[in-house]
């Protein structure tokens, strides 16, 4: 497999951790994540955001669509972070796409993320959003009586909830 050979070559060349940023369009996300990590990836990033074209109807041109994620993009990130972290114990996951505020960060941690990327929020609001997010997380942790992230990381992942079907179901009708 091309990805496995690339991971192995990169790992032979560098001495830093190698995380693979995955697309949410792969057929079996947990299986692909497992394959990547057993073949050398130090973890995965969920998810890569695709270039999204748009059509300018006034100038009759293809143009760049919205390059930034939004809150509605977070649902897939939470779902798959929770499923993968629950099905593959010990996997390192960075949640990405749709993370815009401190509550989104906490949700990703509860789903099982080890790290969170919030690039669109930083581009939109500036780097100062990071300190604001950290302050709000600390306040929430204090109110919830948590002293460390490890106390709640993964608490609501696939393996730790009474009804895992909440993550499996993706259609309105069964």
Where are these regions (language model features)?
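Alpha/beta enzyme core
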Residues: 1-94, 100-118, 162-170
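Alpha-helical scaffold segments in soluble metabolic enzymes
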Residues: 9, 35, 83, 128, ...
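Residues in flexible loops and secondary-structure boundaries
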Residues: 54, 107, 124-126, 130, ...
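C-terminal helical cap(s) of enzyme catalytic domains, especially alpha/beta-barrels
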Residues: 55-70, 123-146
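Extended, intrinsically disordered, low-complexity segments
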Residues: 74, 135-174
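Small/polar loops that bind or transfer phosphate-bearing groups
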Residues: 96-97, 125
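Gly/Ser/Thr-rich helix-start
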Residues: 98-99, 155
């Amino acid at each position: 497999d091309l990805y496995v050979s690339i991971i192995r070559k990169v790992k032979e060349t560098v001495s830093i951790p190698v995380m693979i940023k995955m697309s949410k369009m792969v057929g079996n996300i947990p299986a692909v994540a497992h394959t990547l990590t057993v073949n050398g990836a130090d973890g995965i990033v969920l998810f890569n955001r695709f270039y999204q074209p748009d059509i300018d109807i006034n100038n009759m041109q293809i143009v760049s669509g919205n390059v930034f994620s939004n809150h509605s993009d977070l649902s897939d990130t939470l779902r798959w972070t929770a499923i993968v972290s629950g099905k593959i114990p010990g996997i390192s996951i960075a949640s990405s796409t749709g993370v815009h505020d401190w509550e989104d960060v906490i949700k990703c941690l509860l789903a099982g993320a080890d790290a969170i990327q919030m690039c669109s929020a930083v581009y939109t609001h500036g780097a100062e959003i990071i300190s604001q997010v950290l302050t709000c997380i600390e306040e929430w942790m204090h109110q919830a009586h948590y002293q460390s992230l490890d106390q709640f990381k993964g608490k609501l992942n696939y393996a730790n909830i009474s009804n895992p079907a909440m993550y499996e179901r993706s259609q309105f009708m069964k």
